[in-house]
Amino acid sequence: MWCLAITGPPGAGKSTLARKVVEELKKAGLKVCGTSCPDVREGGRRVGFLIVDVEDGSRAWLARVDCEGPRVGRYKLCPGAEEVGVRALSKDCDVYLIDEIGPMELKLPKLREAMLRVVSGNKPFVAVYHARLRDEEFLRALSRCHKIFVTKDTREEAWKEALEALSSFSP
């Protein structure tokens, strides 16, 4: 079973690399499902994060400074995020994307369960994970994957490594 695990410090280009890998998979005719959690900025200042279903584009706020849910750092989790994420990761696809496995996503029990089901399963996936991930279940599941550590200085090398990993992929 093929999987790619991408990690590195914030702002290194992990999500960009994952997006490029997904584009290559789609060009090969594969159906990719899963989640992406981009940040949202207003006036140059980050105000929160969305959770987006990468297959159909549906979205909800994952966390904002003004939501009502549990706090993670300076943000609070928002209602509706879990539903979008679980639905996206429950679809029947050729390859799954999880961007990212981080503190906010892991704080939502049903989303955590859906992400763990994907990374522990038998379907191919691409996962971006927080560099300080300490969750043993996820670390164990990701240990079977080809890992790429991205930094601002190694983005080009990381892309070459991802292309090499893609060359060994067969659906």
Curated annotation (Swiss-Prot):
Residues the record lists as binding ATP: 8-15, 95-102
EC number, as in UniProt: 3.6.1.15
Broad class of enzyme this protein falls into: hydrolase
Pfam families linked to this entry: NTPase_1
GO molecular function terms listed in the Swiss-Prot or TrEMBL record: ATP binding; ATP hydrolysis activity
SUPFAM superfamilies referenced in this protein's UniProt entry, alphabetically: P-loop containing nucleoside triphosphate hydrolases
Catalytic activity: a ribonucleoside 5'-triphosphate + H2O = a ribonucleoside 5'-diphosphate + phosphate + H(+)
Highest taxon of source: Archaea
Keywords: ATP-binding, Hydrolase, Nucleotide-binding
Family: Belongs to the THEP1 NTPase family.
Function: Has nucleotide phosphatase activity towards ATP, GTP, CTP, TTP and UTP. May hydrolyze nucleoside diphosphates with lower efficiency.
Protein name: Nucleoside-triphosphatase THEP1
Organism annotation: Ignicoccus hospitalis (strain KIN4/I / DSM 18386 / JCM 14125)
Taxonomic classification: Archaea, Thermoproteota, Thermoprotei, Desulfurococcales, Desulfurococcaceae
